[in-house]
């Protein structure tokens, strides 16, 4: 009763709402109301009104905080359900909470969805990791094997099959000998092993690709070139040794074995080819005077080795006649090569001094390209004779396999 007096506006609402239960209570007990006295009826009606007002005030108090503090109520219900009903599953708890709290459905659904997601997402994330760590599909295993084969080096295996073993030897003394060259890109030094039988001799075996390789020796911290190996010059004019590596010749026995293996792997022949093979195996005598014809090949004369040197290599007269006839056939009776030239060959070209020795030479040099000069004139100053009051000075420089000729024409005043 104290709560209703402090809020007169709520009293009116509660009285209006509570008329129905009062009438219902009175209707339910008509016999008692008729049999009791007026004083007893008044006391009973007062008690009934007090009970109804208390019920309405409790329901009104319970309805107001549902709108103001829905979140706090929800938290309390979750905590009470977790403590009071530990045996109930989480899914059923969430469903009952949604059914009971119809006023705050939007906020409660979001919070409940977050809770369910938090409990279920780790399981979903953990299952593929466990599967990947424990088991892998055959497709992934095949990809891993292919990657391992690629990492092992497919091109390197091809190169190793083409490499040829080569022995490099140094025979000019020294205590420590190393070799470096184009096969190491001039960056690494490979130590040579001394020979136990021969003092001052070193050797090493390398596997190199076919081609030309240049190298130099480092003997006691000094760059040197072997006199027992072919020598050439590099781009800077320094002497280097070189070696030409060739692919080994194929062994005929191995080829025969491979051909037999290839024949064994061939598919079965057709009917016609099998008949042809059977005809080849038939006897030579066909009857009635017909026989198979076999051509008798003349045997080759046996060859023998001899120590006699032919006269063309020992007799000077025979050698001179032999080379003279060869040159005559090649030059078509041109004997100009027998006389020495007045100038070096590079200065007799059309580009240099407009001079032609013969008409044939003009026809040969009409392309405008100079012939390959001799190596002794490289990096030298060459001059020609003064013609028409003009002096010609030239120099030739080589870069790899190209030759560059620079010509300077200087006029000379006649005194």
Swiss-Prot record:
SMART domains cross-referenced by the UniProt entry: AMPKBI
Region Disordered, annotated ranges: 1-43, 55-158, 249-276
Sequence ranges of Basic and acidic residues compositional bias: 122-150, 249-264
Record's signal peptide: none
Lipidation, N-myristoyl glycine type: 2
PTM (free text): Phosphorylated by SNF1 in vitro.
Residue numbers spanned by region Kinase-interacting sequence (KIS): 154-335
Gene Ontology molecular function: enzyme-substrate adaptor activity; protein kinase binding
Compartments where found: Cytoplasm; Cell membrane
Summary of the function given for this chain in its UniProt record: Beta subunit of the SNF1 kinase complex, which is required for transcriptional, metabolic, and developmental adaptations in response to glucose limitation. Has a structural role, mediating heterotrimer formation, and a regulatory role, defining carbon source-regulated subcellular location and substrate specificity of the SNF1 kinase complex. Involved in the regulation of aging. Acts as a negative regulator of nuclear SNF1 activity in young cells by sequestering its activating gamma subunit at the plasma membrane.
Name of the protein this chain belongs to: SNF1 protein kinase subunit beta-2
Upper lineage: Eukaryota, Fungi, Dikarya, Ascomycota, Saccharomycotina
